[in-house]
């Protein structure tokens, strides 16, 4: 289950990158910092394309999968827990003589 979600996560990440790069630019650097605000406020409302909507959905799915992958452990227990259990089982199996 974990590896299937991880594979899906990587595929969505690649498709999200591609869909982001395929989108049309909305201006140069000045527009990113508010330089093109007059055009966006007074101009015709921007029509969201299918690519824009797909990018939104892919981004949301990417975030949900990231949260799922952080919650779902790929194995039960951690390395530290396994080493503690191993040490405890070895300690029970051997008898220690009292220090004489």
Swiss-Prot record:
GO terms for cellular component: plasma membrane. Residues 33-48 are cytoplasmic. It is found in: Cell membrane. The keyword Transmembrane applies. It holds the Pfam family SecG. The chain crosses the membrane at residues 8-32, 49-70. Residues 1-7, 71-100 are periplasmic. Residues 77-100 are annotated as: Disordered. GO terms for biological process: intracellular protein transmembrane transport; protein secretion; protein transport by the Sec complex. The keyword Membrane applies. Residues 83-100 have a biased composition (Polar residues). GO terms for molecular function: protein-transporting ATPase activity. Keywords: Cell membrane, Membrane, Protein transport, Translocation, Transmembrane, Transmembrane helix, Transport. It is a multi-pass membrane protein. Belongs to the SecG family. Subunit of the protein translocation channel SecYEG. NCBIfam families: secG. Component of the Sec protein translocase complex. Heterotrimer consisting of SecY, SecE and SecG subunits. The heterotrimers can form oligomers, although 1 heterotrimer is thought to be able to translocate proteins. Interacts with SecDF, and other proteins may be involved. The channel interacts with SecA via subunit SecY. This is Protein-export membrane protein SecG. It comes from Aquifex aeolicus (strain VF5).
């Amino acid at each position: 289950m974990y590896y299937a979600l991880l594979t899906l996560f990587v595929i969505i990440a690649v498709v999200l990158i591609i869909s982001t790069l395929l989108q049309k630019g909305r201006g140069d650097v000045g527009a990113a910092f508010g330089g093109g605000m007059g055009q966006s406020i007074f101009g015709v409302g921007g029509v969201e394309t299918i690519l824009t909507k797909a990018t939104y959905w892919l981004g949301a799915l990417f975030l949900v999968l990231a949260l799922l992958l952080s919650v779902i452990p790929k194995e039960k227990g951690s390395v530290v827990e396994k080493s503690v259990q191993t040490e405890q089982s070895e300690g029970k199996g051997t008898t220690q003589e009292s220090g004489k």
